[in-house]
């Protein structure tokens, strides 16, 4: 640490504390403000748009300073946290009246993007995720926690940076910690990331924190179940949280392992291409996600992150959706759910010490809805719904306690009291009555003093600096009784106090202090009582979230005309009248549905041709979205859906230059294609849209053909849209390849898209007609038509030569054997003639 002896004592104290928190902003409490100094002040002034000033000089230089009022700090902190930065809160812990030198101060809390619990800092509909990455021997061990959910999840060991990136971005964390300084420096995730000191990833320390933080039985189970490197990753989260909280994270009550074999995998590019869960109004989540609670919205996002292939889980969800859909029973349930607050986060705030009085009122009001909800669920007496209902705990005792203890509209904090309801505590009521009755005493006392002095303008008042006083104008100085003691002199008046008024003041102020202390004690005791229900409330919250999502699915099924999918083990995907929900939602005319059939026995690869705007991309996307919906347990936009086991969805749709990495559009396209080719299997669904456009015609055709052939050989279910009509010939070479196209009709120089998938290859691309629709001027269109005519004429003359130049490695001169073969008409010769020709050629 640098020499700080030339600084003032207060700045010396600040610098000592700041040296322990160099990478985060230090909010340093001074009276009614949190102050920031030096570089922190400059950064905060820019981030928060607050004034940058200077506080005198220290070590001969002006000290940059910026500050925010402590009572408004929450709003400023929220801005900083949402920008991905962290803050250390440094409070005055010493008594200013007894301190010699600067008041003692300590950092009481660290606030980071993923470790906040206050409502102002959080997105109600999104989990606050902290990811830990332990890199060792070119492997990545990953664990994450949804902070306010109170759980840690362990992910399978990852063996490549690309796999790690996809896993992390799927989680969309607010914060990442790691042992790898190189990974933190590269930051391929573009998320807040920090490399921690080595001890955070010590296996010895990890086991210690697991034992200290978790229930004994859970800790023992974890230590026996997982390997050392996995334990190290789990322990890193617990040690980090302990350091952040300055306390043991007791709210973490569960550790679980995510089984990848039960998950439908979708890489981050495919998620973006399919518009699954981005923030746009056209995303699938925005159309499907109409949950009534924050609990349900967050759970639905988890479903979107981890679609399950577990058929038992899917069958359970479908059964509940059907039950809730009967007579639209979900409407009654959703009405009750709309009154339930975020009890999961409220109980976490209780455990973390950040709960506010209004949270307790919201908790009480939410728990009051549970008997109604349980009754509605019991009306659907199915095993699946009963199972959920049994995990919703009716906490009548807690409701009664909170109802008796907390006033209806409490203040924001307990700091100034006024939270506990009258009648809850006798001692508190007595202390408050002294203050409440003070007004009557002061009225009587003032009237008595007026009579005693004969001064009708005499006033009795109070201010926070001088306390209670008797105020008289200076013109009445000759009438002042001898027992009046001067307290304050003003320009036109004097203020006095008497022994009686001083005794009353001491009694009132003492009662206020005692009442506030008593109220805080009652409040703390109340929170300890509430936390006894932690596990029951967490389990109740999880069950409410589940029923909210499924009631939402039931409502969406009816509103959007969705049907229940079936699952088969026949390697067959049969879909009828499939629709694209976002497009259907955003157009005025009726959406034209399409059928899709993919089967190992008939076709696994569809070559899709047709004009731009004809419907090719929509067709492919809607199939992928349907599969995705089926695997989150929703009903699907089709009249019929029979789905086989799909373990991964890959897409190669659209592209743009990756300028920051120096990669062209074509390079991006090829990189993504290579990833798909290297990982696709017979259980994959692959969407390929117009591959090979970013290079020369024949290079593009060659690559597109080779990729299509590879997918045919793999047997992956592949929808392959292309403008290379030559690829339609693959259907003659591979029995598992078929052609479909999207029709268009021409009428009086206009084009009309049918948006209907038809068997066979397209015969025309209609590019010029599409250009006309786009608004290209008539003179350009006429020129294009002439150019097209010339090009087609030229191609007819040179096509065979060009194709040979592109694909043929041998000399173009045919040998006699080749000439003989070319002369044979295989459509007219008999089998016997063919054998004779073969025998003759063999003799040569």
Curated annotation (Swiss-Prot):
GO cellular component entries: cytosol
Binding-site positions, ATP: 610-617
Statement: the UniProt record of this protein carries the keyword Magnesium: no
Alphabetically ordered keywords of this record: ATP-binding, DNA damage, DNA repair, DNA-binding, Nucleotide-binding
SUPFAM superfamilies documented for this protein: DNA repair protein MutS, domain I, DNA repair protein MutS, domain II, DNA repair protein MutS, domain III, P-loop containing nucleoside triphosphate hydrolases
Gene Ontology annotations of biological process type: mismatch repair
SMART domains registered for this protein in UniProt: MUTSac, MUTSd
One of the record's GO molecular function terms: mismatched DNA binding
A family per Pfam: MutS_II
Function: This protein is involved in the repair of mismatches in DNA. It is possible that it carries out the mismatch recognition step. This protein has a weak ATPase activity.
Classification via PANTHER family: DNA MISMATCH REPAIR PROTEIN MSH1, MITOCHONDRIAL, DNA MISMATCH REPAIR PROTEIN MUTS FAMILY MEMBER
Family listed: Belongs to the DNA mismatch repair MutS family.
Name this protein carries in UniProt: DNA mismatch repair protein MutS
Annotated organism of origin: Francisella tularensis subsp. tularensis (strain WY96-3418)
Taxonomic path: Bacteria, Pseudomonadati, Pseudomonadota, Gammaproteobacteria, Thiotrichales
